[in-house]
Structures are given as structure tokens and as C-alpha cells.
Amino acid sequence: MDKTSKLFDVWANTGRSEDMEKGHGTTVNQFLDKLSLKENFRFLDIGCGNGWVVRKISQKNSCTKAIGIDKSKMMIKNAKSKILSEKESYFVTELESWNTTEKFDVIFSMESLYYSVPMEFALEKVFKLLKKNGVFYCGTDFYSDNTLTTRWRKDMNVPMDLRSEKEWKMMFKTTGFNTHSKHVTDSKNKSKWKREFGTLFVIGSKP
């Protein structure tokens, strides 16, 4: 088990998965609630934690299947204990080594892709998992433009791939995505960076 998996197992056992759900919830829900999703879509959440996004999406009538993956066994255990719908499935796996024939219309990731160092291999796997015209919505608070979060790598002492917004978008384009980005802020949050920089969402559409 690598350092990142061990860390997130500890977090799952100490209530941090619920803390992350609450901490990310404002900007993620703002973003997800504005998405226009097609009929009969299949959804994947990479680094799903306790499965809160999978549960939210599975409640949409147009969602036919919602899968969450995480390399933390304890996070997946938590997610399975909270299942609300038969549409939901959860798997303990790293993205890059996940052996699946599944294809998805929508793939989502919040604060997880940068734990794959370097990120290019993970992003290539995402591209392969998407159907034609599928979309990858990738959220991150850890990017070099947001200088107040760059210390996280030292604080957490696990491998993390730090890029600028420009570098994120270039990486998506190089992989083959049509790409744009947007920031979602939380104007009432006590943290300055959440008010001013917010969550960076890089959006990639597969041609």
C-alpha cells in the first residue's frame, strides 16, 4: 500500500471523509447543479471518497449507472455503507491499473487526479474510459496560481503533482481533449483562497 492510500485510510477512519464532503460541498454542488447532463448517462467518480458525489448523481432520473473508484479500502468501505441506489457501484482500485471494459458519458474527479504523479498517465486513462463526446469534469484546489494551497504537498508529505491553470489546460489539450476551465468560489467562506481563487474546474470534452 502506498503512502497516499495509507493516509486516506486513516482519514476514512477518523471522519475526514465527511469533513472533505462538507469542505468541498459548496463549490462542487454549485458546479454540479449547473451541469446539463444528457439522458441515460453513465457516470464515474475518480477518487470518490465516501461516495457523496456518486450518491448525488445516482438520484438523477437520467443517470443509468454511477460508479465510484478510490484506492483507499476504508473510503470504499464507507461509501458502500451509505449506498442509496441500485445504480451505485464502488471499487477499490488505482485509476491507471483499473481493468474494466466500462465506458462513460461523464467522468468527475475532485481533488484526486494530482495524486497520480505525473498526471499524464491518469489523464490518458480517463480519455480511454470516455465515450465519444463524453466529458471529464476535473476539480482541484491545489494549483500553483492558488499560492495559499501550494504548501499542502509539504504538509501532507505524499506525492502531489502541482501545475498552473495554464499547464492543466495544456495537459488536457495534449491528451486530445477540447478544453476550457472555470473557477467556482465560495464568497462566504472564512478562507481567503476559497473566496478569491476557489476551485479550479478543468473541463475536457472527447471529440
Q: What does each model-identified segment do?
A:
Residues 44-46, 50-97:
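Class I SAM-dependent methyltransferase SAM/SAH-binding core
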Residues 188-207:
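Core SAM-dependent methyltransferase catalytic element
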Residues 141-159:
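Short, glycine-/aromatic-enriched active-site segment of Class I SAM-dependent methyltransferases
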Residues 1-36, 56, 78, 144-145, ...:
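Conserved class I S-adenosyl-L-methionine
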Residues 108:
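A conserved beta-strand element that flanks and buttresses the S-adenosyl-L-methionine
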Residues 120-132:
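A short glycine-rich, Lys/Arg-flanked "PGG" loop and its adjoining helix->strand segment in the class I
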Residues 133-140:
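Conserved beta-strand signature within the Rossmann-like core of class I S-adenosyl-L-methionine
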Residues 160-176:
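Short alpha-helix
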